[in-house]
Amino acid sequence: DVEISGMKFNPEELWINSGDMVIFTNKDMVVHDVTQDPGKEWTSKPIPVDSSWKKVFTLSEDYLCSIHPIMKGKIKVR
């Protein structure tokens, strides 16, 4: 799973198996989202502080926070 804190996704790169669900939990002081990059083919709703969002991944994908685009991460599927 991925924790959002300190204006970063932690870990920035997460290895999973195809079909695994990843939970993104916002432990930062501000709202964030999780958006596929590039292309924005999928995006979460804004994730409030102390809330989470889940997604099942079948392919490796890069993502960012569209609110704070300097924040980037990768899901790597084995």
PLM features per residue range, with description:
Residues 1-78:
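Extracytoplasmic copper-binding redox domains, predominantly the cupredoxin/blue-copper superfamily
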